[in-house]
């Protein structure tokens, strides 16, 4: 299912905070540090793990690293970056096999991109993962071609 990916230069699981964090270098037209984070959130009275990714930047006020999910790098390697991000899902479920991952883009266009990836690879995703979408105030089983505000992914029970 997944094409070429970048190697991770850092993988970190912080048990006390329940956060899983990956760092890699996008090596397109420039070298851009990228980060992927799975962090616990609560939405509609349910616990999920937000799957966030973007450029790894330093907060000018605190000096701490954070994920900038609004900048568009336009680095010429979008497929490799996207495949690298997707590759972290199976690693996440090794730590949290019963969890549900929440996917929502920082804007509508990005959420559509994530949905189109699932549409394209649905035949390869569906045997392993349960995918649901939130629309019109309800969580429903994923149907290719349907618009959703956000997506939820969990590992299928074996």
Residue ranges: model-predicted function:
Residues 1-158:
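Non-catalytic substrate-recognition and accessory regions of acyl/acetyltransferase enzymes
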